[in-house]
């Protein structure tokens, strides 16, 4: 029987979550969904001084917005301390762990001596018990750390799903501290116990964890447990080519929601930021989950490009059904103090403007102009509303006052005014657009007018 896929996302709640972080949630989520497995959320909150519930809430909010639903969790490491200590006791009893009484001053002196000798700084095994070895006298009043007895000789080898075969000599690994003097376990040990207890089959995470992997594999083996499959994702770079981080100006994921990006568009963009399916650039969430596997993860760092993200979002806006788009844009209209709009009218208006927009914020801006109109700039008025066109504007106002208020009837009224005045369409359309929408660039004039209130249109035209 094939083992069920179980993946996890294990963020530290020490600040907001940015796109580089959330991509490390997207891929394990997608792999679990693509294979009928489970996706687990684990909060690695052992850095008590920097962790906060507010940061946890932001992580969950960002995941919820993107639709990255989890099957189990959130589990909190700080709530599992008893379990970690129980496994530590098992390892002590099995001889895999030993107490080390070396002081910080002694470790610093050892490190300085090794660096002076051009050696790699590492713990030298002073307190590691070996057959026939006499250990130093235990100093009084010193609480030891617990170190993992790393295997000597041989190598740790794994086939990384992104980086390929990786081999690290055990001689490169010293005996890792897995519990502090106060008994609290350290990161690498907690991760192994969590992955073991949660039966994680695939660890998909950033490549900043590669150096932790051989140590974690050795702890897995000491516990007699099967080692999960590892896939270490390349770094996400910002637009300046630096590692994406809060320090380097990365935005919270939730800010993209506020800026009017669609969650499916963000999933599409993030998916392509390190994975590919041929030349396909635009795809739905459902297509992504049908196509996703670990074999097509990229090996090189991916660079964020906000212009490309806007383009992807624009494609999803265009493809979205008008009634769905009308529902999505309403919170953004509310932020502009526009509400109570007819659902059918709103869907029609979205259909008219969505091809011109990259975000829901932009779409809401256009829709507000339909409702409230705009004050044109003096420059646009002087350029487009000339003495030559004013009589035509007056004629159009008269025609619109009596015609049926439909796109076809409005188009016929405009055509008649053009015939009567000898003007070309741009000569009439430009000033009307400026007066009503505050810009000479809009969709077709008859479509715009049919969606605006007749009284407002006529009042604006009569002002000149």
Swiss-Prot record:
<keyword id="KW-0067">ATP-binding</keyword>
<dbReference type="GO" id="GO:0005524">
    <property type="term" value="F:ATP binding"/>
</dbReference>
<dbReference type="GO" id="GO:0008270">
    <property type="term" value="F:zinc ion binding"/>
</dbReference>
<feature type="binding site">
    <location>
        <position position="246"/>
    </location>
    <ligand>
        <name>ATP</name>
    </ligand>
</feature>
<dbReference type="GO" id="GO:0005829">
    <property type="term" value="C:cytosol"/>
</dbReference>
<comment type="subunit">
    <text>Monomer.</text>
</comment>
<protein>
    <recommendedName>
        <fullName>Glutamate--tRNA ligase</fullName>
        <ecNumber>6.1.1.17</ecNumber>
    </recommendedName>
</protein>
<dbReference type="GO" id="GO:0004818">
    <property type="term" value="F:glutamate-tRNA ligase activity"/>
</dbReference>
<dbReference type="Pfam" id="PF19269">
    <property type="entry name" value="Anticodon_2"/>
</dbReference>
<dbReference type="InterPro" id="IPR014729">
    <property type="entry name" value="Rossmann-like_a/b/a_fold"/>
</dbReference>
<comment type="function">
    <text>Catalyzes the attachment of glutamate to tRNA(Glu) in a two-step reaction: glutamate is first activated by ATP to form Glu-AMP and then transferred to the acceptor end of tRNA(Glu).</text>
</comment>
<dbReference type="GO" id="GO:0000049">
    <property type="term" value="F:tRNA binding"/>
</dbReference>
<comment type="similarity">
    <text>Belongs to the class-I aminoacyl-tRNA synthetase family. Glutamate--tRNA ligase type 1 subfamily.</text>
</comment>
<dbReference type="InterPro" id="IPR033910">
    <property type="entry name" value="GluRS_core"/>
</dbReference>
<keyword id="KW-0547">Nucleotide-binding</keyword>
<dbReference type="InterPro" id="IPR020058">
    <property type="entry name" value="Glu/Gln-tRNA-synth_Ib_cat-dom"/>
</dbReference>
<keyword id="KW-0648">Protein biosynthesis</keyword>
<keyword id="KW-0030">Aminoacyl-tRNA synthetase</keyword>
<dbReference type="GO" id="GO:0006424">
    <property type="term" value="P:glutamyl-tRNA aminoacylation"/>
</dbReference>
<feature type="short sequence motif" description="'HIGH' region">
    <location>
        <begin position="11"/>
        <end position="21"/>
    </location>
</feature>
<dbReference type="InterPro" id="IPR000924">
    <property type="entry name" value="Glu/Gln-tRNA-synth"/>
</dbReference>
<keyword id="KW-0436">Ligase</keyword>
<dbReference type="InterPro" id="IPR008925">
    <property type="entry name" value="aa_tRNA-synth_I_cd-bd_sf"/>
</dbReference>
<feature type="short sequence motif" description="'KMSKS' region">
    <location>
        <begin position="243"/>
        <end position="247"/>
    </location>
</feature>
<keyword id="KW-0963">Cytoplasm</keyword>
<dbReference type="InterPro" id="IPR049940">
    <property type="entry name" value="GluQ/Sye"/>
</dbReference>
<dbReference type="InterPro" id="IPR001412">
    <property type="entry name" value="aa-tRNA-synth_I_CS"/>
</dbReference>
<dbReference type="Pfam" id="PF00749">
    <property type="entry name" value="tRNA-synt_1c"/>
</dbReference>
<dbReference type="InterPro" id="IPR020751">
    <property type="entry name" value="aa-tRNA-synth_I_codon-bd_sub2"/>
</dbReference>
<dbReference type="InterPro" id="IPR045462">
    <property type="entry name" value="aa-tRNA-synth_I_cd-bd"/>
</dbReference>
<dbReference type="InterPro" id="IPR004527">
    <property type="entry name" value="Glu-tRNA-ligase_bac/mito"/>
</dbReference>
